[in-house]
Every structure is written in C-alpha cells, then in structure tokens.
C-alpha cells in the first residue's frame, strides 16, 4: 500500500482495511518529526503499531526506519538532521522489537558513509525525497531483508530467489 500525502490518522481510519494482508509495511515519521515532539511522536507510533497488531493479528508487520535526508536538509530543519533521525530510528527499532514486529533499517541501503542520503539517490529540491534509483534501492532492500515467501517471487528478477 502506498499512502503518499496521507496522514497516519487517515490510514488508521480505513485504508488499511482494504489492503492485502500478507504483510504490512509501516513507515511513519518524516513529516511527523517536524510537527511533534520526540515523545509525542514515539507515543503516537507505539499506539499506531498496537492498533495494527490488534486489527491484523497474525500478519507479519515490518516497521521501517525513517530514511536519511541530505546534510543540507538537516541544517534547514533540525528534526530531520540525520543524527537525530538515527536516535529516533533506534527508538523505533526498540518499539518494534518490544511488540514482536520486524524492523527494517533502510539506512543500510540509502545512507552514505556520513549517514546522509546518498548523493546519487537525491531526487528533489527538498533533500528528503529520492530519485527512481534511490527508490529502486529501497525496494530492493525491502525485498532482500524480509522473511522469505513464494509470493515475493513475482517481484524478484535476479539472485537466488528469482
């Protein structure tokens, strides 16, 4: 399910009931980090994960890290500075593990040696969104870092699972 431009509240109120329930992938945070305190953000995230677990009991839930931004974006908006994002991602990982969910650290695939969004993945003026190459790297990371399922074969064109 892709929910670009929708709020987590909108997702919580109905969109999820119409989606496939083989797996659920959650990414919440980039916009919310700007508008909420860290404590409010983590409380909301915890509640959201609890609701998903309750509503979709038995369905694997993959909680994704917040993706890195450019160094320039972190200067413009301190909540999106990559050191801060790493701290929040650590808290998100702890939340996921404490609730028995999977955690995917996309930073491994998207960040450069300094922890910033790789330059060849930057796609827009905002330093947050990626270009098609970046999104492809992200999708590849997800496909290669989730629990194996024959269902995934339709998305894999190379490698040992193709």
Task: Mark where each language-model region is.
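Generic structural signal for well-ordered alpha-helices
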Residues: 45-50, 89
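Short, flexible, glycine/charge-rich loop motifs used to bind or transfer phosphoryl groups or to couple energy/partner
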Residues: 13-16, 52, 118
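Short hydrophobic alpha-helical module
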Residues: 27, 52-55, 83, 95
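Conserved SGNH/GDSL esterase-like catalytic core that processes O-acyl groups on lipids
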Residues: 1-47
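Catalytic His-Asp segment of secreted/periplasmic serine-dependent ester chemistry enzymes
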Residues: 68-162
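Structural recognition of the beta-strand scaffold that forms the well-ordered cores
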Residues: 23-28, 32, 60-65, 102-105, ...
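Internal catalytic-core helix/loop-beta-alpha segment
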Residues: 49-58, 62-68
């Amino acid at each position: 399910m892709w929910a670009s431009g929708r709020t987590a509240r909108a997702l919580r109120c109905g969109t999820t009931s119409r989606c496939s329930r083989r797996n659920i992938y959650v990414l919440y945070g980039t916009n919310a980090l700007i508008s909420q305190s860290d404590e409010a953000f983590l409380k909301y995230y915890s509640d959201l994960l609890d609701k998903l677990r309750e509503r979709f009991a038995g369905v694997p839930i993959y909680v994704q890290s917040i993706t890195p931004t450019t160094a320039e974006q972190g200067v413009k908006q301190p909540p999106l500075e990559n050191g801060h994002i790493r701290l929040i991602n650590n808290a998100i990982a702890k939340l996921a593990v404490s609730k028995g969910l999977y955690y995917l650290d996309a930073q491994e695939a998207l960040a450069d040696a300094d922890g910033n969004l790789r330059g060849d993945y930057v796609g827009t003026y905002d330093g947050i969104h990626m270009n098609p190459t970046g999104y492809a790297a992200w999708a590849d990371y997800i496909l290669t870092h989730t629990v194996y399922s024959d269902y995934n074969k339709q998305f894999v064109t190379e490698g040992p699972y193709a």
